[in-house]
Design a protein with these regions (language model features):
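Short intrinsically disordered, low-complexity coil segments enriched in acidic
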Residues: 2-3, 253
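Bacterial N-terminal signal peptides
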Residues: 3-14
């Protein structure tokens, strides 16, 4: 879902090309790893999105989010100017630390080139200045982010096979078949590394904290925007304690109703159950109002997937992210606990967009 946050930047950059043409997302395409873990420059937008819960020696959990975006501008390749970018690289990083009480986050944006910013094909290798995510030959990821006020140096190691979303990786995002992406997830990544936490008084703490934990990585690429009547979306990626993995999302229309919805639940035996738009429901339980933007977010929700109901409660309420300096959106994105029938069953990340403002995603 997240690459659509790049739409505002992409549309603004379209001055470099009057009629850009991008590769189409079509059903029946076979995702091949590790080759498809790399960049797909022919498509309009792409992103690598890692989220997770971290355990610390003081038993105070943290949440983290790291995202790298690639956005094609449609720049005419016949223009020899090195300063007219064909690709933009954008990065977000955030740390949810209850001791701080609000989200610590940072963002970067740069044109691809000069070895300072790139997204390479064939294998995950994305860099923006000193921020990077690299997939090693054994499939694990090395992530380095030295941000304003905090840092994340993490290794993410697969413990399960990738989960192809939708129809073998072809993931519908709206009523028209071209409103789709190629999309796979890697749930239950084992996390090791160090985190420098933000200091409560500002700046950052001096010493790194050794952490372990579990993460979820999404990789998605597309050339189409959401339907023009879309207001925003709600997305969930959950690592469940029994080894299962749950992904669910809904696209909200301007009338408040779900325009599209989908969910996939893979059990610990590897069997996948999918749920269509009429089987998925997000229902607010409690809202929190941002003191900065006055936006009410449904930070506690129930999510129904068929006959199953999941309760989501945040690690902390204030996980609002302001990305107006890069992708142009303000939204809520944070660590949540997952329960069923009052029992703790997992850890997840929840993304809530279009509550501060309707997404200005343009028209196809």
């Amino acid at each position: 879902m997240r690459a659509l946050l790049c739409a505002g930047v992409l549309l603004a950059s379209s001055v470099f090309a009057a009629t850009p043409e991008f590769a189409a997302v079509t059903p029946g395409h076979s995702i091949s790893l590790a080759q498809d873990s790399g960049a797909h420059d022919g498509f309009r937008t792409e992103w690598w999105y890692a989220t997770g819960w971290l355990d610390t020696p003081d038993k105070q959990p943290l949440g983290f989010q790291i995202t790298f975006f690639r956005s094609a501008t449609g720049h005419d390749p016949a223009d020899p100017s090195a300063f007219a970018p064909s690709q933009l690289i954008i990065a977000h990083a955030a740390l949810s630390d209850p001791a701080l009480g609000h989200l610590a986050h940072d963002q970067r944006i740069a044109r691809q080139g000069f070895g300072l910013a790139y997204a390479k094909p064939d294998n995950t290798d994305v860099k923006l200045d000193a921020w990077k995510i690299v997939r090693a030959a054994d499939g694990h990821y090395e992530v380095t982010v030295d941000a304003d006020g905090f840092s994340l140096h993490l290794a993410l190691t697969p413990t399960q096979a990738p989960l192809l979303q939708g129809e073998r990786g072809y993931s519908r995002k709206g009523p028209r078949p071209e409103q789709a992406s190629y999309y796979y997830s890697e749930p239950h990544l084992r996390v090791t590394g160090t985190v420098v936490r933000p200091a409560a008084a500002g700046g950052r703490s001096k010493d790194g904290t050794v952490v372990t934990g579990a993460a979820w990585l999404d990789h998605e690429w597309s050339s189409t925007l959401l339907d023009a009547n879309a207001l925003g979306w709600d997305w969930l990626g959950a690592n469940l304690t029994d080894g299962s993995a749950l992904m669910a999302f809904r696209i909200r229309g301007r009338d408040g109703r779900a325009m599209w919805a989908h969910a996939a639940l893979r059990n610990r035996a590897g069997e996948v159950t999918t749920f269509g738009r009429d089987q998925v429901d997000f229902t607010p339980v409690r809202t929190w109002r941002s003191p900065r933007t006055n936006t009410p977010y449904p930070v506690s929700m129930t999510v129904k997937t068929g006959a199953l109901t999941w309760r989501l409660d945040p690690l902390m309420d204030d996980q609002e992210l302001d990305s107006r300096q890069s992708t142009g959106a303000v939204y809520w994105e944070g660590a949540v606990r997952v329960s069923r029938d009052g029992a703790d069953v997992g850890r997840a990340y929840l993304e809530l967009t279009g509550y501060a403002d309707a997404l200005r995603i343009g028209r196809d």
